[in-house]
């Protein structure tokens, strides 16, 4: 067994190899298992090969919004219009957030979103996934689970991004509109795949 160490911005660490090696030494010196380093990736996986990380979590949200393209134009338009312009229907976003080839590969883990709207923080420059529902969330889960189904058991990992501190409209918790809808759908999908142990826990 290893300790999971997730790095949100590997490129923000100038000496990544030294950083990883240092933490492995600290783990060994303190009688801990080695770390398993996973780096968050939003662009090409090919650019990451050869670095010190063990695996990658692939986040394709930017691809769904085409954020890498026309960035300057988008920023300029956000100042001109009194409303967010970077809006995509969740039903379309869930297709763009999935890579049928890469998500099947070993040591590449999907990152998926139940919803996204950080307009309370970003205002008119916000990115918004509009029209998310528990049913569409279930469709995304089912698709991604099917892609990792044939991986080795220890490699069947999905990261669900639900961090409403930074993206206020990015959450799984019960709300007034859908109640426990998102959690119930996820529970249903996981039980369907028999990912719970005999005690009913993850």
Predicted features by range, described:
Residues 1-13, 156-165:
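Active-site groove signature of glycoside hydrolases
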Residues 13-35, 170-189:
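Surface-exposed flexible segments
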Residues 182-202:
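Carbohydrate-binding surfaces of carbohydrate-active enzymes
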């Amino acid at each position: 067994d290893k300790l999971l160490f997730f790095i949100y911005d590997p490129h923000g660490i100038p000496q990544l190899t030294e950083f990883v090696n240092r933490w492995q030494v600290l783990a060994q010196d303190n009688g801990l298992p080695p770390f398993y380093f996973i780096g968050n990736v939003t662009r090409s996986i090919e650019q990451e090969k050869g670095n010190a990380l063990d695996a990658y979590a692939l986040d394709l949200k930017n691809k769904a919004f085409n954020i890498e393209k026309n960035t300057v134009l988008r920023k300029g338009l956000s100042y001109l219009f009194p409303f967010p312009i970077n809006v995509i229907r969740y039903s379309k976003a869930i297709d763009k957030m999935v890579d049928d080839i890469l998500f099947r590969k070993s040591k590449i883990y999907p990152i998926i979103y139940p919803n996204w709207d950080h307009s309370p923080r970003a205002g008119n420059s916000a990115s918004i996934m509009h029209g998310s529902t528990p049913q569409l969330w279930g469709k995304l889960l089912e698709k991604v689970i099917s892609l990792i189904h044939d991986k080795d058991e220890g490699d069947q990992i999905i990261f669900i991004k639900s961090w409403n501190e930074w993206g206020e409209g990015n959450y799984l918790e019960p709300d007034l509109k859908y109640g426990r809808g998102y959690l119930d759908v996820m529970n249903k999908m996981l039980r369907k795949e028999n990912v719970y142990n005999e005690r009913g826990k993850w």
